[in-house]
Regions:
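Bacterial N-terminal signal peptides that target proteins for export
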Residues: 1-8
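Cleavable N-terminal signal peptides
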Residues: 10-11, 16, 21-22
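Short pre-active-site segment immediately N-terminal to redox-active cysteine/selenocysteine motifs
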Residues: 30-36, 79
Length: 128
């Protein structure tokens, strides 16, 4: 009986672990003294992990001097900040620079929906 329980547990655990291992992540490449990197961190850094996008693609930061540690980049990182959507060591898309909160969210959502199974939550606007 114990063997059956272990097999059932294994059957249900492996897909969950596999899904987590294949999760997307958003890599932010920054550098010391980067004004727009600081702007992003001040405006969005504290809320990003709480958003649907942040839960789907958790943020991992690298200094531009550490960019060689990132496996699977399609091209060099020239600008900071650069946000790179990665999955299984493969670059899916990138955003170079940061100009505003609205612009960032809109572009990130487009990349996530196009390149992954992410579906953005629908916002219902009401008129008062």
């Amino acid at each position: 009986m114990h063997l059956i329980k272990k097999i059932v547990l294994l059957i249900f655990t492996v897909p969950i672990l596999s899904k987590n291992l294949m999760a997307a992540e958003l890599i932010m490449v920054e550098q010391q003294g980067c004004y727009y990197c600081e702007e992003w961190k001040d405006q969005l850094g504290h809320i990003y992990p709480k958003t649907p996008e942040g839960k789907y693609a958790p943020l991992k930061t690298f200094d531009i001097t550490e960019v060689d540690e990132i496996k699977g980049l399609e091209r060099d990182v020239i600008f900071t900040p650069t946000f790179i959507l990665m999955e299984k060591n493969k670059e899916l898309g990138r955003l170079e620079g940061y100009s505003s909160e609205d612009f960032f969210w809109e572009l990130l959502e487009v990349i996530l929906e196009k390149e992954t199974e992410y579906t953005a939550p629908k916002v219902i606007k009401t008129i008062n």
